[in-house]
């Protein structure tokens, strides 16, 4: 169960360390995600890949790197494992013979559909930890940080 409390904020210099605070926030978000999706659920990265592939069939792994922000080597390993699990299918790209195109399998589409409400519930729980007036700003700031990683 996720624990919350303001006492953890009073840790001296760590209380103003963005890297420390982001790490703690990530731990909390991962705990909530795991509670909502369950032990057999998709990981956050698996969900991100399936969601991206659902938006556009035939994406190359390079395009998936850009869409998900997952680094190239991690994504290659992830796609290989997801293909072995039957969540994705790979084929030669029609646009670039050197590249492999990725698309959802029927199993991947079913798992994605089942995961969406669970991930939405996790996201709602995370956002509910913030006052309503801060939620949009928080999301915008996270998007800015994520965009800086792509720059």
Question: Residue locations for each model-derived region?
Answer:
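N-terminal leader segment of winged-helix/HTH proteins
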Residues: 1-40
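C-terminal regulatory/oligomerization modules of transcriptional regulators
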Residues: 1-14, 132-151
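Short helix-to-turn junction characteristic of helix-turn-helix DNA-binding domains
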Residues: 22, 53-57
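Charged, amphipathic alpha-helical coiled-coil/dimerization segments
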Residues: 30, 58, 62, 80-144
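Short alpha-helical "packing" element that flanks the helix-turn-helix/winged-helix DNA-binding module
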Residues: 49-50
